[in-house]
């Protein structure tokens, strides 16, 4: 039996979400149509509004409806002298939830990957360079992912910072809280040893 073309279209479009395959998309579509039509309509309105109104902050490149985001507009953060460089906007939310950072951000929207044609310009390093020249940061904290590409990106940015005599650091990577040593991979364990701190 052939399904409704509109239903097939809905299922196909739900598959654009990360981790959503054909079966998950079908379950979502049937759930919205059978049990939660008002939720589906609210979702459609929220998506339409977000897609048309949310852009990027002109300073940090995070998502915002304004020219500059709330973090960049915060005078306390403007005077902190701290800049944290992250790969994706979602990384800002993760860091903000810790409550441990009170500076400003710069979002790369990816990482260096020459094989994929992603060089310094594609991830906005020309814009970062401009900020390093025009603003007075005393420390840049690199919060790129602990991958080969993340490491290469961090090293490239670290060299940029050194050229401007700006202190540069990288967030530590290691064993998760509650993790057991026997289940941790060798690379993570190595980073844990290299990033060890003295106990006072």
From Swiss-Prot:
This is Recombination protein RecR. Coiled coil: none annotated. A zinc finger (C4-type) spans 57-72. PROSITE patterns: RECR (PS01300), TOPRIM (PS50880). One of its GO terms (molecular function) is DNA binding. SUPFAM superfamilies: Recombination protein RecR. InterPro entries: DNA_Rcmb_RecR (IPR000093), Rcmb_RecR (IPR023627), Rcmb_RecR_Znf (IPR015967), TOPRIM_dom (IPR006171), TOPRIM_RecR (IPR034137). One of its GO terms (biological process) is recombinational repair. Belongs to the RecR family. May play a role in DNA repair. It seems to be involved in an RecBC-independent recombinational process of DNA repair. It may act with RecF and RecO. The keyword Zinc-finger applies. Residues 81-176 form the Toprim domain. The gene is recR. Pfam families: RecR_C (PF21175), RecR_HhH (PF21176), RecR_ZnF (PF02132), Toprim_4 (PF13662). PANTHER family: RECOMBINATION PROTEIN RECR (PTHR30446:SF0). CDD domains: TOPRIM_recR. Keywords: DNA damage, DNA recombination, DNA repair, Metal-binding, Zinc, Zinc-finger.
